[in-house]
């Protein structure tokens, strides 16, 4: 299982949200490039970045910082937030983004997903953010009537191979992930599932790994000191090699 440390960008700084509430954002680091470098030094093989300003406005807002991170760390980066059209996807892939995450756009525009997958294949991922099992869109401000499992199955048919799943009620809470919803999703599709939201300690990571989940995104637990990234990667890798 791969561990992806998270950088959420708001106005050029690293922040953390609580249950997806933008009003409850807290700055955890002033310099995202420094944070990314530290993640790399601690063994990260992949970094998860969200442009929160982009998620709200529908346009990438922190591209210069994101580009600097990519050039500085030289390890794969996946990016979500505000990616609504093929031109933006083209621009991000050209900028060096390894995997582009579509959320709102995927629910509102299935044709975009089809075109993007046809052009970029596994470089396109889907972010499913759910509240009470319904898919949330527009920076988590609106809850659709679409069930998260149904949406995942539809995306799999289009050709999506990677799904990032977040239970919004768990995000930023350090209360543990929604294991029940994760299990159901992992059993419903053959895509790689990346768990996100609520992961609080190494024990959560061990449980997720035992569920045969492909990856786990860790944010607040690293910034708060609950999880030592270097130690977590070593432990999970050690268990993988058994």
Swiss-Prot record:
Catalytic activity: 1-(5-phospho-beta-D-ribosyl)-5-[(5-phospho-beta-D-ribosylamino)methylideneamino]imidazole-4-carboxamide = 5-[(5-phospho-1-deoxy-D-ribulos-1-ylimino)methylamino]-1-(5-phospho-beta-D-ribosyl)imidazole-4-carboxamide
GO BP terms: L-histidine biosynthetic process; L-tryptophan biosynthetic process
Highest rank taxon of the organism: Bacteria
One Gene Ontology MF term: 1-(5-phosphoribosyl)-5-[(5-phosphoribosylamino)methylideneamino]imidazole-4-carboxamide isomerase activity
Pfam families per record: His_biosynth (PF00977)
GO cellular component: cytoplasm
Localisation per UniProt entry: Cytoplasm
Family recorded in the similarity comment: Belongs to the HisA/HisF family.
PANTHER family: 1-(5-PHOSPHORIBOSYL)-5-[(5-PHOSPHORIBOSYLAMINO)METHYLIDENEAMINO] IMIDAZOLE-4-CARBOXAMIDE ISOMERASE
Protein name, UniProt field: 1-(5-phosphoribosyl)-5-[(5-phosphoribosylamino)methylideneamino] imidazole-4-carboxamide isomerase
Taxonomic lineage: Bacteria, Bacillati, Bacillota, Clostridia, Eubacteriales
């Amino acid at each position: 299982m791969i561990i992806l440390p998270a950088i959420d960008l708001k106005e050029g700084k690293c922040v953390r949200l609580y249950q997806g509430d933008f009003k409850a954002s807290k700055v955890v680091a002033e310099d995202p490039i420094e944070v990314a470098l530290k993640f790399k030094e601690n063994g990260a093989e992949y970094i998860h970045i969200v442009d929160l300003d982009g998620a709200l406005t529908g346009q990438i807002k922190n591209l210069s910082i994101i580009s600097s991170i990519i050039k500085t760390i030289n390890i794969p980066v996946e990016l979500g937030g505000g990616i609504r059209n093929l031109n933006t996807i083209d621009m991000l892939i050209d900028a060096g983004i390894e995997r582009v995450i579509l959320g709102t756009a995927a629910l509102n525009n299935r044709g975009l997903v089809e075109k993007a997958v046809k052009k970029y294949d596994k470089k396109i991922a889907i972010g499913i953010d759910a509240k009470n099992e319904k898919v949330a869109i527009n920076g988590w401000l609106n809850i659709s009537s679409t069930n998260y499992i149904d949406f995942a199955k539809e995306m799999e048919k289009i050709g999506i191979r990677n799904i990032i799943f977040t239970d919004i009620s768990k995000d930023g809470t350090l209360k543990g992930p929604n294991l029940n919803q994760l299990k159901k999703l992992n059993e419903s599709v053959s895509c790689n599932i990346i768990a996100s939201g609520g992961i609080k300690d190494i024990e959560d990571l061990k449980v997720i790994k035992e569920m045969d989940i492909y990856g786990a995104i860790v944010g607040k637990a690293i910034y708060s000191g609950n999880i030592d990234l270097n130690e977590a990667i070593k432990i999970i890798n050690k268990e993988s090699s058994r």
